[in-house]
């Protein structure tokens, strides 16, 4: 083993010790799970985290698959500021697609030695919502009012890896689609997680084609104002800022198409994506 490899090994061991018994909320987007190799790499990375006594909680999206099915059905997908406009038909499609993705992720993790369990935001009052009107009326899109963190903590105590589908409910029983980035951030805040990690299909936060390895809250907001951050990255950065202001120590954006990018980002000094901190 070379001296360089030894140095990396010591880095990994140091971080493993630091993060033992800590909670990581990992949001994985549908686009990052398009390829079989990416699915396998992600599942193995999550199982590794559990083996080194980190508590991973997965929140998954499904935007790519939802859009694909809508197009196949002749329904035009609409977005506003990165958020999906969700009428009743779109909500039905979203729930169906998200349920399938949830089962696929659970199966993949379990096949690689994990103990994952799939849950919906409607299970045990996990995600109580109200209609989100921050971007105008965009239909059945929910703003989370309360997270039943005790439910998740019970699952962790039983050595489960929770895989959460971002669908919630209102006090009147109305079902709401929740942006998965928002759901992940709110769950991380509720659990006082150590890290919030976005596994996407881009290297991280980009400017002029170059990766930005480190960002603080002030500069993250500036990138949104300047239009550098746009589309689906807007909710991620907004959620990252909210999480950091609420006490989450760091937020990361990594490319799930790179094998084990999640572990490289967490367990090495320089990482592979973008790390955001408050200052």
Curated annotation (Swiss-Prot):
One of its GO terms (biological process) is arginine biosynthetic process via ornithine. Its main location: cytoplasm. Pfam families: AA_kinase. Its EC number is 2.7.2.8. It catalyses: N-acetyl-L-glutamate + ATP = N-acetyl-L-glutamyl 5-phosphate + ADP. The keyword Ribonucleoprotein does not apply. GO terms for molecular function: acetylglutamate kinase activity; ATP binding. Signal peptide: none annotated. One of its GO terms (cellular component) is cytoplasm. Keywords: Amino-acid biosynthesis, Arginine biosynthesis, ATP-binding, Cytoplasm, Kinase, Nucleotide-binding, Transferase. Substrate binds at residues 62-63, 84, 177. The record marks 27, 236 as: Transition state stabilizer. Pathway: Amino-acid biosynthesis; L-arginine biosynthesis; N(2)-acetyl-L-ornithine from L-glutamate: step 2/4. CDD domains: AAK_NAGK-C. It comes from the Bacteria. The keyword Ion transport does not apply. It is found in: Cytoplasm. HAMAP family: ArgB. Catalyzes the ATP-dependent phosphorylation of N-acetyl-L-glutamate. Belongs to the acetylglutamate kinase family. ArgB subfamily. PANTHER family: N-ACETYLGLUTAMATE SYNTHASE (PTHR23342), N-ACETYLGLUTAMATE SYNTHASE, MITOCHONDRIAL (PTHR23342:SF0). This is Acetylglutamate kinase. It comes from Pseudothermotoga lettingae (strain ATCC BAA-301 / DSM 14385 / NBRC 107922 / TMO). The gene is argB.
């Amino acid at each position: 083993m070379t001296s360089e490899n030894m140095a990396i090994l010591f880095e990994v061991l140091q971080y493993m010790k630091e993060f033992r018994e800590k909670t990581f909320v990992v949001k994985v987007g549908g686009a990052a799970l398009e390829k079989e190799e990416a699915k396998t790499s992600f599942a193995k990375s999550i199982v590794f985290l559990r083996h080194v006594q980190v508590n991973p909680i997965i929140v998954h999206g499904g935007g790519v698959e939802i859009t694909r099915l809508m197009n196949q059905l002749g329904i035009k997908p609409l977005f506003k500021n990165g958020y999906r406009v969700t009428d009743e038909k779109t909500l039905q499609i979203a729930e169906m697609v998200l349920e399938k993705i949830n089962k696929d992720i659970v199966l993949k993790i379990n096949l690689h030695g994990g103990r994952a369990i799939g849950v919906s935001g409607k299970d045990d009052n996990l995600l109580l919502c109200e209609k989100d009107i921050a971007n105008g009326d965009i239909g059945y899109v929910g703003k989370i009012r309360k997270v039943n963190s005790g439910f998740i903590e019970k699952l962790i105590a039983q050595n489960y890896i929770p895989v959460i589908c971002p669908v919630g409910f209102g006090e009147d029983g109305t079902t709401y689609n929740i942006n998965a980035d928002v759901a992940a951030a709110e769950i991380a805040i509720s659990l006082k997680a150590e890290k919030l990690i976005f596994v996407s299909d881009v290297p991280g936060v980009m400017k002029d084609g170059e990766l930005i390895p480190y960002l603080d809250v002030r500069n993250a907001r500036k990138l949104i104002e300047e239009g550098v951050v746009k589309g689906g990255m807007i909710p991620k950065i907004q959620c990252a800022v909210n999480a950091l202001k609420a006490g989450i120590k760091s937020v990361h954006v990594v490319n799930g198409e790179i094998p084990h990018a999640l572990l490289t980002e967490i367990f090495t000094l320089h990482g592979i994506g973008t790390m955001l901190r408050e200052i």
